[in-house]
Amino acid sequence: MIGMVLVTHGRLAEELRAAMEHVVGEQRNVATVCIGPDDDIENRRNDIQHCIERVDTGDGVVLLTDMFGGTPSNLAISMMERKGVEVLAGVNLPMLVKLAKVRSNEPLAAAVDCAQEAGRKYIASASHVLHSGKLNGSGNGGGG
């Protein structure tokens, strides 16, 4: 099973995990690292490293960050030297739900691709969806 570590500004990681588990049920091998404005960056880097070690079952680990280029993302990227670690920036709930569903039976690269696609697919303007009947070109106008 692919491990997941959410690394975000503020408490967002904890709230996203709670929302994901509300949708798909309790998840194993998931950890969160919340980065506050006054946190010591090296302490948070160590926290990320420990979380990777804790959730890694040998199938890889995805570090999910809130915004590419931000401190959480930069810290996560610094962990990519480690084999089997991927970073996916711009985390949202559809991305997490998809990753939770595929991480037991897909290899790391395929799981990341599925999660990224789901994250993009469900970004939508309600007025556009209601007028066109399409959710980002899917034609079904429906959810996941």
Task: Tell what function each PLM region has.
Residues M1-G144:
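N-terminal loops that bind phosphate or other acidic moieties
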